Amino acid sequence: MEKQWWKESVVYQIYPRSFMDSNGDGIGDLRGIISKLDYLKELGIDVIWLSPVYESPNDDNGYDISDYCKIMNEFGTMEDWDELLHEMHERNMKLMMDLVVNHTSDEHNWFIESRKSKDNKYRDYYIWRPGKEGKEPNNWGAAFSGSAWQYDEMTDEYYLHLFSKKQPDLNWDNEKVRQDVYEMMKFWLEKGIDGFRMDVINFISKEEGLPTVETEEEGYVSGHKHFMNGPNIHKYLHEMNEEVLSHYDIMTVGEMPGVTTEEAKLYTGEERKELQMVFQFEHMDLDSGEGGKWDVKPCSLLTLKENLTKWQKALEHTGWNSLYWNNHDQPRVVSRFGNDGMYRIESAKMLATVLHMMKGTPYIYQGEEIGMTNVRFESIDEYRDIETLNMYKEKVMERGEDIEKVMQSIYIKGRDNARTPMQWDDQNHAGFTTGEPWITVNPNYKEINVKQAIQNKDSIFYYYKKLIELRKNNEIVVYGSYDLILENNPSIFAYVRTYGVEKLLVIANFTAEECIFELPEDISYSEVELLIHNYDVENGPIENITLRPYEAMVFKLK
């Protein structure tokens, strides 16, 4: 396996709207990020993934782009962005931009032109179809509820939008679209960026004919089998690599809902020349029932272990894993798989240990390193996320479902859990802004904030810093093989990493109860060294350990 800088890096995702506001308008901005770079350097971050900062009407918080080569006014200017890149490079940090090219905003110039007439030169930049018998061209539903088709009076046709109606899908089968996208990518790469995270990139190739989904169900249904990992996806990614990516020393990760391990090998195998990593979602769907995301069910540790292990083993020799618990679309991990009450600190450290000792490139989401939690707003009016608001409208207003039950599912799964402002200190609005924040700060900011974390040497922040240092100083963490042990233990997640004669033993209690770890007999060693631990502990025998609630430890064995 080839050694690469992006395999050895730790990435930190910034959601700019909620990170730091420099001018008091209640919205995080680029100058706010610049002011916090030293904090991220102290943590040990190598790469910052910046969620979209391009010009946008903000229907989906910047994932609806109206100009790919301009900066959104709320975030600052291109000069601010240039300064951010310069300041990051001065600190030996790299910048990965968000590439959102499955769709644009309906306010993008391409779409404004495309709507005008059927023979406009931009018409085929998007996917237009006549209706069928007075209805939509097919029965596909949109991710944010309703139909995936929007009728447009101007030309008496419908356009496809897999997300909101203000996010029309680009027609990637049109070579001009692809070339314009590649030119835009080169614009940013020539400015000196170090990579792209690609939004729902496995949606860009739609099945020819856009077939109706065969189903007994009434209404709109997911058409994912007709656009996820579609017929030309590898052709287009290979072309993108050949024409753009391969000419720069950069890192790439493709967000790919529904991707399997076998498909991931095709996307990330080095000899295939497509992408370096994918974001897969299987471990993020384990607490969803048959009704999808909002149908919340408990996730057993056995299932979680089995799933993460499957990905570790599948990409052991081909491709590369991305490691994450959190991002801007997911609830907070300490509330989801940990214990955000009595054992918040212990369980946040335990979850970090399990993830960061695996093979792959770890991604930390803002606030994760201080153990930020989910939020419980009393009223739907305090929520801002289009997905949450549309779901509430559909379930409560249109179907009359129980408000309490719907709010409960929002508390557990809503995307705004990740989007409340970063908690910097215990001052007003957690030090995020001097104005009124665009979304309310989580009320627990007085107990959970960066200032307090930096003053306490036993904080979650310093634990993350130490995990990152372990990765930097031990090649085994980056390149060692992975093997699950105690696979049928319902309470303990334990695995072994091996690199030459070295071994790492990682042990984690996923419960609020004590439990006993027994070392499997086939693990032999002559020396043992404790590398990191989330309780006070002495070096001792490892054959039989009573683990306290959410206890985690890593040993080096020789």
From Swiss-Prot:
Its EC number is 3.2.1.10. CDD domains: AmyAc_SI_OligoGlu_DGase. GO terms for cellular component: cytoplasm. The keyword Metal-binding applies. The record marks 329 as: Transition state stabilizer. This is Oligo-1,6-glucosidase. Ca(2+) binds at residues 21, 23, 25, 29. The gene is malL. GO terms for molecular function: alpha-amylase activity; metal ion binding; oligo-1,6-glucosidase activity.
